[in-house]
Structure formats: structure tokens, C-alpha cells
Amino acid sequence: MVRRRTASPSPSAPVRSAPRPAAQSSFAAPPPRPAAAAPAYHPPAAPTPMGAPMGAPSQGPGLMKQMAATAGGVAIGSAVGHAVGGMFTGGGSSHAEQAPAAAAAPAGAPQASGYSQPCEFEWRQFVDCAQNQSDVSLCNGFNDIFKQCKARYA
């Protein structure tokens, strides 16, 4: 006989006895058998396929490159916004047309007089961007400005 450490018996489900068939019926069904609780069969989980080992996530451009790209985008957006606004308002006087052109150029940008070709400054901006950026699509704004300059001087 197994000894228990606790004084009280472990809790279990109450056991009911089946009612006894009456003696009058000779075709009574046999008493139901208690169902044995068989554990359900669970097949082992299939191992997950091993892919390439997870490496360190690739880092994007540095903080300074992101700031430069953002500043370039802001400058391009400002230039395009002024150009579109000038088209809608008709440009006004010649004084009003010169102000957006001066505002669109960065403060340290060299003037066109230092270059031999009319759109050389815009071309160099595009080339510098393409050489410094890993994604050339970030330089599409410089390319568009260069194309606008070529169309203006063609």
C-alpha cells in the first residue's frame, strides 16, 4: 500500500454508480463501462526549416547623409514650389521673379559667373549627389532642375 504525505485524500471526480436494472426486465442493457481517459495523441511538431542565419541588420546612410538629403529635398521643394506659384500668379514684376531665384539658391552656392556653361552649376549638383548617394533616385530633383535649366537656355 502506498503511503501519502498528506492526511487528506487527493481530490478526484465523484464516482457515480450506475442504477441497477430492475429484476423485472430480462433484456436490460449491461451497465456502462467507465471510459478510460486516454491521452490524445499529439504528433511532434515539425521542425521549422532553417533559413539563412540572421545577420546584423544593414545600416542605412549615416545621420549626416540623411540630413543632407533632407536639406536637398527641402531646397528642391522650395524651388519647385516657387516656380509653380509663379506660373499661377503670372510672375508679377521682374523684381518679384528675381526674389524666388535668389531664395532657391543656397547661401554658399557659387554664382553662375564662375562656370563656363550656363547650366554647369546644376549639372555639378546632380553629379555630386549621384556620387555621394547610394540610391540615385534621391538625386532626381537635381536632374529635373538641370533639365529645366537646359530647356531655359536651349
Swiss-Prot record:
Keywords attached to this entry: Disulfide bond
Region (Disordered): 1-64, 86-109
GO BP, sorted A to Z: determination of adult lifespan; mitochondrion organization
UniProt biased composition (Low complexity): 7-28, 48-57, 96-109
Motif (Cx9C motif 2): 139-149
Name of the molecule in the record: Hemiasterlin resistant protein 1
Annotated disulfide bonds: 119-149, 129-139
Domain CHCH intervals: 116-154
UniProt motif Cx9C motif 1: location: 119-129
Gene giving rise to this polypeptide: har-1
GO cellular component: cytoplasm; mitochondrion; nucleus; striated muscle dense body
Organism phylogeny: Eukaryota, Metazoa, Ecdysozoa, Nematoda, Chromadorea
